[in-house]
């Protein structure tokens, strides 16, 4: 994986003696790739790429976004109109969000149509479904953060859906909203989910997903 000039350098040897870099790189480079693999098997990697773009652009916007019902919309306008390249960062965030959902859906269809969910990869499929649910939750929570008319009513509708569940429906609505009505507590909860809870959740699920794929390899042709 490394050139001869690199492996013979003293710096490389220093790191290799302590971290076994060569062994790790050989293990990565020597992983068998079945001959039937085509471009459609890259959809999972494209979904991950979109997530990394989301993470970077979202992190950049947290320096300017204000998660309050009185300042959220104005802070988004400030990002779009005043911050250097803010319009580009937010636009990339929105575009990559849509692309991430699309790539995720196509990836799920590819795995299903090629039988990648069958034994012994059932748990990989289950974790993948959990990743899909987390991705959709990212979209729902992020949609509300500008706190414009679209975001407000989207939150009101989504948070009101659990009310149809018998016995615990009203309690779930209150839990999601933070109070009986949509307001500051709701925005705070959605912001916390979007910027802290969900990123950690998806990071753990991605790690499990990749470890399983690494262990079991790519499924064979139908």
From Swiss-Prot:
Q: Which PROSITE patterns match?
A: CYTB_NTER (PS51002)
Positions annotated to bind heme c: 42, 214, 218
Q: Name one GO molecular function term.
A: electron transporter, transferring electrons within cytochrome b6/f complex of photosystem II activity
Keyword tags: Electron transport, Heme, Iron, Membrane, Metal-binding, Photosynthesis, Thylakoid, Transmembrane, Transmembrane helix, Transport
Residues that coordinate or bind heme b 1: 41, 107, 110, 209, 219
InterPro entries the record matches? Cyt_b/b6_N (IPR005797), Cyt_B6_PetB (IPR023530), Cytb/b6-like_sf (IPR027387), Cytochrome_b_N_euk/bac (IPR048259), Di-haem_cyt_TM (IPR016174)
Enumerate the residues binding heme b 2. 90, 93-94, 194
The principal location of this protein is membrane
Residues crossing the lipid bilayer are 39-59, 97-117, 123-143, 193-213
Localization of this protein? Cellular thylakoid membrane
Task: Show the GO cellular component annotation of the record.
Answer: cytochrome b6f complex; membrane; plasma membrane-derived thylakoid membrane
Function of the protein: Component of the cytochrome b6-f complex, which mediates electron transfer between photosystem II (PSII) and photosystem I (PSI), cyclic electron flow around PSI, and state transitions.
* Homology family: Belongs to the cytochrome b family. PetB subfamily.
Subunit annotation: The 4 large subunits of the cytochrome b6-f complex are cytochrome b6, subunit IV (17 kDa polypeptide, PetD), cytochrome f and the Rieske protein, while the 4 small subunits are PetG, PetL, PetM and PetN. The complex functions as a dimer.
Q: Which PANTHER family match?
A: CYTOCHROME B (PTHR19271:SF16)
Q: What is this protein called?
A: Cytochrome b6
Q: Which organism is it from?
A: Synechocystis sp. (strain ATCC 27184 / PCC 6803 / Kazusa)
**Gene name of the record:** petB
């Amino acid at each position: 994986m490394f050139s001869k000039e690199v492996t013979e350098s003293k710096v490389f040897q220093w790191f290799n003696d302590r971290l076994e870099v060569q062994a790790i790189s050989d293990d990565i480079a020597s992983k068998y790739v079945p001959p039937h693999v085509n471009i459609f098997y890259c959809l999972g990697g494209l979904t991950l790429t979109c997530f990394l773009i989301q993470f970077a652009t979202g992190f950049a916007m947290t320096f300017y976004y204000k998660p309050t019902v009185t300042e959220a919309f104005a802070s988004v306008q400030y990002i779009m109109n005043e911050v250097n390249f803010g319009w580009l960062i937010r636009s990339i965030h929105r575009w990559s969000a849509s692309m991430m959902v699309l790539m995720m859906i196509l990836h799920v269809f590819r795995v299903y149509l090629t039988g990648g969910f069958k034994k012994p990869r059932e748990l990989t499929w289950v974790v993948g479904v959990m990743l899909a649910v987390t991705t959709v939750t990212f979209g729902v929570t992020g949609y509300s953060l500008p706190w414009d008319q679209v975001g407000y009513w989207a939150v009101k509708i989504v948070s009101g859906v659990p009310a149809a569940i018998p016995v615990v429906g009203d309690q779930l609505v209150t839990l999601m909203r933070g109070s009986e009505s949509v307001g500051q507590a709701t925005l705070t909860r959605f912001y916390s989910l979007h910027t802290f809870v969900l990123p950690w959740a998806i990071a753990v699920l991605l790690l499990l997903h990749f470890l399983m794929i690494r262990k079991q390899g790519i499924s064979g042709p139908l």
